[in-house]
Amino acid sequence: MTNLQELPSRGHLLTEQINPASQNLDQLTPLELVDLFNQEDAHTLRAIAQAREALAQTISATAARLRQGGRLFYIGAGTSGRLGVLDAAECPPTFCTPPHLVQGILAGGDAALVRSSEGLEDRYEDGAAVVGDRQITAQDVVIGISAGGTTPYVHGALDAAQGVGALTVFMACVPVEQVQRSADIDIRLLVGPELLAGSTRLKAGTATKMALNIISTGVMVQLGKVYGNRMVDVAVSNRKLLDRALRILTDVTGMDRAAAAALLERSGYQVKRALLMHWTGLDAPAAQALLDQQNGQLHAARSAALDP
């Protein structure tokens, strides 16, 4: 146990400060509480807007690494880590990515997803060990997520990632003057003090989730996983996603649902491949070969086939 006399105060951190708007939180009616939360959550949108350039840089730099065979790692503890795991877990069904491409790493491992293991965030050495355990290299991207900016586990991971030349991104909800951190890209989501003082699962967590949504979706757009605003690399793994795949085909091509079903089956249940087959008359292997030549970019593959 840390000597209490030596424990530094974190009260100066933005995420730990008292929100004057909620001084009487325990006296509010349920409706007043809902209204106050709704009012405060507007700060998350402003925080994302203020971080727009750093988010865009992260998308571009991450996509470039992934095109060269790299991977994306989200690393965090508590709510921050769980949000990284959540975003990573959504990539395979949404974009048909292999599970290793985007990985979420949480202090305490899978058990910490359902049972808080807050003490593990203090273990700098555990974060550093992740880099070796996952064989992170200079091709990879490591996004360290820490709402308060001080999590030793996250700093250990980022320091070790820098040591092997990985692209590093630091995401925190405190200003630079409160917590400084060397990283290739620095994302600050300044949502202000929480309504429940120090509870960063609230606005800080919401802004973090928004930022991760933007990053992962933006990267996948850059990698050609989207056509228009359709998830044409969707993994057809259940009835809902099968229906979505059929609707994408009918909407984009104008064919009826029966024809779309037949096309989808011929394509091996690959929507992007099916679209290219429809437009070009290619069979499934030839369509896939053309997509591979064009790095998965459907627009480019279609142009190459129709306007050689």
Curated annotation (Swiss-Prot):
Q: Which UniProt keywords apply?
A: Carbohydrate metabolism, Lyase
Listed under catalytic activity are: N-acetyl-D-muramate 6-phosphate + H2O = N-acetyl-D-glucosamine 6-phosphate + (R)-lactate
Q: Where is the active site?
A: 90, 121
Q: Which SUPFAM superfamilies match?
A: SIS domain
Report the residue ranges that make up the SIS domain in this protein: 62-225
Is Lyase among the key words of this record? yes
Concerning Gene3D superfamilies, the annotation shows: 1.10.8.1080, Glucose-6-phosphate isomerase like protein, domain 1 (3.40.50.10490)
Keyword match Lyase: yes
Question: Entry's InterPro entries?
Answer: Etherase_MurQ, Glucokinase_regulatory_CS, MURQ/GCKR, SIS_dom, SIS_dom_sf
GO biological process per UniProt: amino sugar catabolic process; N-acetylmuramic acid catabolic process; peptidoglycan turnover
One GO MF term on file is: carbon-oxygen lyase activity
Q: Which residue ranges traverse the bilayer?
A: none
Superkingdom, natural source: Bacteria
Q: Name the PANTHER family on file.
A: GLUCOKINASE REGULATORY PROTEIN (PTHR10088:SF4)
Extra information: A lyase-type mechanism (elimination/hydration) is suggested for the cleavage of the lactyl ether bond of MurNAc 6-phosphate, with the formation of an alpha,beta-unsaturated aldehyde intermediate with (E)-stereochemistry, followed by the syn addition of water to give product.
The job of this chain, per UniProt, is described as: Specifically catalyzes the cleavage of the D-lactyl ether substituent of MurNAc 6-phosphate, producing GlcNAc 6-phosphate and D-lactate.
Protein name in the entry? N-acetylmuramic acid 6-phosphate etherase
Species lineage: Bacteria, Bacillati, Cyanobacteriota, Cyanophyceae, Acaryochloridales
Gene designation: murQ
